[in-house]
């Protein structure tokens, strides 16, 4: 009887095919797993990169915003100072204008013009014409009286008083002119016409605020293009 010889599994063609197939399948699985890991890793890296860029951009925005807030904190007092200075200038300008308008009322020529304009409106003059003139004209009394001497057709009585008004009256008519009231009316006219009013000052200051805010928040003032953003490696 022949003796059966057992073959080694390693040398078995069938087993060899099985082993090779398993190795091949294992290699394919490894390759597949490697590709999967590579894809996942790439996606993770990309996600990290995007988040890094987002964080960087957000940090850029946060820093820019903080800078704007700091600048606004610096500029707001300056605008308040501007408002205060504008208000002072407005008051000074009005006072200067009032002084300029009041100055002519101290001139004899102006007083005479006022008197003549009043007289021409009277239908007739009967009896004396009484003039009450501010005491500021006392040093010009000769000049005033000489005018009425030339106008001897009028019986004029001149009295100096502490009031700042010019008062003219006869037995039938009376009129007065107040230089101060005149310039006050001029001031009110300017205010009503929005030229020198406090509202105008506020309007200018609001325009300054809006202009400042617009300039500081202009879209073109912050270019978020990646090409101009420094990378963390460059910082």
Swiss-Prot record:
<protein>
    <recommendedName>
        <fullName>Putative uncharacterized protein YgeN</fullName>
    </recommendedName>
</protein>
């Amino acid at each position: 009887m022949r003796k059966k010889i057992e073959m080694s599994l390693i040398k078995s063609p069938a087993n060899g095919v099985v082993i090779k197939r398993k190795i091949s399948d294992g290699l394919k699985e490894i390759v597949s797993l490697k590709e999967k890991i590579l894809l996942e890793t790439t996606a993770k890296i990309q996600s990290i990169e995007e988040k890094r860029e987002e964080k960087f951009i957000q940090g850029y925005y946060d820093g820019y915003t903080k800078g704007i807030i700091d600048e606004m904190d610096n500029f707001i007092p300056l605008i308040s100072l501007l408002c205060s200075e504008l208000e002072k200038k407005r008051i000074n300008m009005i006072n200067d204008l009032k002084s300029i308008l009041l100055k002519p009322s101290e001139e004899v020529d102006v007083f005479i013009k006022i008197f003549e304009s009043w007289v021409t409106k009277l239908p007739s003059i009967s009896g004396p014409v009484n003039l009450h003139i501010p005491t500021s004209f006392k040093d010009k009394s000769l000049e005033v009286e000489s005018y009425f001497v030339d106008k001897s057709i009028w019986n004029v009585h001149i009295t100096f008083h502490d009031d700042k008004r010019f008062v003219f009256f006869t037995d039938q008519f009376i009129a007065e002119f107040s230089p101060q009231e005149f310039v006050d009316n001029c001031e009110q006219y300017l205010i009503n016409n929005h030229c020198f009013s406090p509202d105008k000052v506020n309007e200018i200051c609001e325009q300054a605020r809006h202009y400042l805010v617009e300039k500081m928040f202009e879209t073109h003032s912050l270019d978020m293009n990646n090409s101009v953003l420094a990378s963390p490696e460059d910082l």
